[in-house]
Swiss-Prot record:
One of its GO terms (cellular component) is extracellular region. Transmembrane segments: none annotated. This is U4-theraphotoxin-Cg1a. The presence of a 'disulfide through disulfide knot' structurally defines this protein as a knottin. It is found in: Secreted. It comes from the Eukaryota. Residues 20-39 form a propeptide. Expressed by the venom gland. Keywords: Disulfide bond, Ion channel impairing toxin, Knottin, Secreted, Signal, Toxin.
Amino acid sequence: MNATIFALLLLLNLAMHNAAEQSSETDMDDTLLIPEINRGRCIEEGKWCPKKAPCCGRLECKGPSPKQKKCTRP
């Protein structure tokens, strides 16, 4: 009885492992690069820059303290 349960669990584990490997294979055409994901949600020049969204274009998040950072030109 225990051997049967062990064999069934082993087969289930192998089946789940194979399914996970097949689902992790992605095509580069189906994936978005990080700049493309944030394209519509970037922070403009002079606006406060939180950690969640990057500054637009070549702007950098600068300021005297972490709470006072704004998107500015480098």
